[in-house]
Amino acid sequence: MSNSVNISVETTCENQIREIGYDGTELYQPPPTLSESLAKCAARIDFSKTSLDDLKKEEKSAAAAADEDKDATQFQESLWPWDAVRNKLKDALTEICVLSDVISIAKDKRYLVLDPLLEEADDTKPIVQVYSRKKAISQAAQVLLSGAERLRNAHSEQRNRNVSDFHIELLRLRQNWRLKKVSNAIIGDLSYRTAGSKFGMSGTFEVTKAEETGDEDTASSSNSSSSVSGNNGMQLKASSALRVIVPAELQGVAYIKVITQKDQEDLCTAQLNLMGHGPNITAQVGVWQKTLEFAQNVLFCKELFAQLAREAIQLQAPIPHVVIGNQIRATLLPNIQLIISLCHSTTFDSSQPAPINDHDHVLEHSLHQLLREVHYKNSHHPFPHPASAPLGPTKKRMLAGPMAADRETLLDMTKSQTILEQIIAQAQHIFMRKRTQYVLDTLARDVKDPQIVSHWNAMNSPTMSCVKINIVTHGYDAIGRTSLVIHVKERSLKCICRDGRVMRLSYEPQELRDLILCQINSHQISCLISLARCMSWTVLSNSNHLGIGKVEPLGNASSCLLASPNSDRMIAVQIRCDPQIDVKVYIARSPRQDFFPSPLVPEKLWENLGGTFKEVRFDKIEGKSFLNKMEFLMASLTSNTA
C-alpha cells in the first residue's frame, strides 16, 4: 500500500519511574516479587469485617442449601446404608486436617508470618531536607528583619518629631474623659452628672489643637492655659499636640480642710481632695491629664462644700451652725467645734505653711463615701411595688401596711441623716473614744493594784466602739476578776457590768472615772471574800454601799467583816474612793483583855463579845498587793490563835 503511514507503538509503562537522570535517562522501579505482592494483598484485607454476623449468615445459607438437598433426595432411596455416616466423618476429618495445618503454620512461622508488614517509606535524601529548612528559616528571618526595620523607622520618626500626633493624643483623651463634638469644637465634661450629681456649676472644657510655632510667648501662654500648679508648686512642662482650656473658676488647687478645735487648740486635722493627701499624684500620659485632674478636683471640692453648707443652713441644731464665706462651724461638744473650710488658690505661694502630718484618713474616706451615697440616691430611685403604685416610697414603706408596721417603725423609715449630720456624729464619736482611752490609760497608770486591762474591739462602726475592761489582781487571777463592757457612742457611754446592770453615762470623763473606781472597790471586796473562804475564815457581813461614816466625795464606801476559824479574831476592812483608793483595816480580839465584872454585867461570859477595833498600819504589812497583805494578815492571826 502506497498510502501507508508508519505508526510508532510504545508499550505502556507498567513500572513506576523512580528517578530521571540529568541526561534524560529514566530509572524504573523493579516489579514486586511474589512475596511482596502477597504482603500487599494481605495488607488490603480488613479483618475487622469478619464478624460473627457474617459467620451466622454463612451457616444459615449452608443450612438452607442442605435442606434443599434433603428435599431432593427424599424421593431417592439410599444406595448404601452407611453413606451418611461416611460423609459426616469425611467432613470432620477435613476440618481437623485444616485446623492442624493452620496451627502448625502459625506455630512454626516457616511458611506464613502473621505479623503486620509496614509499607516501605519513600527514600528522601538528607540534602533535600536541609535545603528546605534553610529556605524556610531564611523566609522567617526576612519577615523579622522587615518588622524590626519598620519599628526602628517609627521610633526614629517619633524621636525626631517634637510635637506628638494630635489624633493619638485625642484618642488617649477620649479613653479617660467624656468628649463630644459640637459644631467644629470638641467639648468635654468634668462634672459628676452621669453619677447622679445635681451641682449647678459647669464642668465643661474645650479641646483645641496646639499651634505649631516656635514663639516662646505662644508656648508660655499655651502652658499657662493647659497646666496647673501641683501641690508641690512645680509647673508642668511637656510638649503636647492638644491644648485643654478649662474655665477660670476651675483653675488652681483646691482642698477641704477639716479642723476640730477645743479652746482655740487644734485637736484633729484632715485635708480632703480628689487626688489624695500630699503631693503624690499618679503619673498619666500627657500634660492634659494632670490639668483635667486638678480641674475636676476643684469641682469636687466645691460641690462637697456647697452640699455641706446647704445642709448646715437647713439643719435645726441646739446650737445653730454658722456658715461664713468658705467656712462652716458646727458645735460637737461643749467647747469643741468642728470647722470645715474650702481652700482654693490659683497661684503657689512659698510662704504657705507646710501640710499638717496629723491627717485623719477615716474622716476623708467618710466624706468621699457619703457624697457618693448622695449621688447614688439621686440617680437610683426605688421602683414602685406594684407597678401601678406611685413613685417615691421605698419597698419597705410599701410593705408597711401588709406587715402591720407600727408608728415608731414608720417614723424610723422616714428618718435620714444628711452628710453634715453623719460627719458631726462621727467626729463626736472620735472625741468620745479618745476621752475614754485617756481615762482608761490614766487609771491603768495611776492604780497599780489591781491591774486594769482594756481590750478594744477591732471591728467597730463609724459611730460606735466597744471596749472590754478586766480588773484583776496579780497572782490571784483564779480567785476572781471583774469584767465590764463599755459601748462608746456619739455623746454617751453605755456600761454593762458583770451582774447585768446597765448604766448610761454622759460625755463627761469624770463619770467614767468614778465608775471604774467603784468597780475597783467592789472587785477588792469580792476577791477578799473569796480569799477568806479559802482560808476558812467566816464572812460575817459585807456591803458595797456603806451607809455610815462621812459622806464620800464620789461613790460609796465598801466594807467587809471577817471572823477567824475559832471566832477569837475579827477583821474589819473599809475601802473608800477619796479620790484615790483608800484602804483601812481594823482588828478586834475576843475575849476582851480589859473586861472587868461590874454590878450591871457581873457574868464573865460577856467578855466574848469582843473588844474595840484597832486600826492596823496597812502600809507596813508585807505584800505586793491588797490581797497579798490580807492573806499574810489572816495567816498570822490564825497561827496566833492556834
Curated annotation (Swiss-Prot):
Disulfide bonds: none annotated. It is found in: Nucleus; Chromosome. Residues 210-232 are annotated as: Disordered. InterPro entries: Mediator_Med17 (IPR019313). Its main location: nucleus. Coiled coil: none annotated. Keywords: Activator, Chromosome, Developmental protein, Nucleus, Transcription, Transcription regulation. Residues 220-232 have a biased composition (Low complexity). GO terms for biological process: positive regulation of transcription by RNA polymerase II; regulation of transcription by RNA polymerase II; regulation of transcription initiation by RNA polymerase II; sex comb development. One of its GO terms (cellular component) is pericentric heterochromatin. GO terms for molecular function: DNA-binding transcription factor binding; transcription coregulator activity. Component of the Mediator complex, which includes at least CDK8, MED4, MED6, MED11, MED14, MED17, MED18, MED20, MED21, MED22, MED27, MED28, MED30 and MED31. Interacts with Hsf. Component of the Mediator complex, a coactivator involved in the regulated transcription of nearly all RNA polymerase II-dependent genes. Mediator functions as a bridge to convey information from gene-specific regulatory proteins to the basal RNA polymerase II transcription machinery. Mediator is recruited to promoters by direct interactions with regulatory proteins and serves as a scaffold for the assembly of a functional preinitiation complex with RNA polymerase II and the general transcription factors. Required for activated transcription of the MtnA, MtnB and MtnD genes. Belongs to the Mediator complex subunit 17 family. This is Mediator of RNA polymerase II transcription subunit 17.
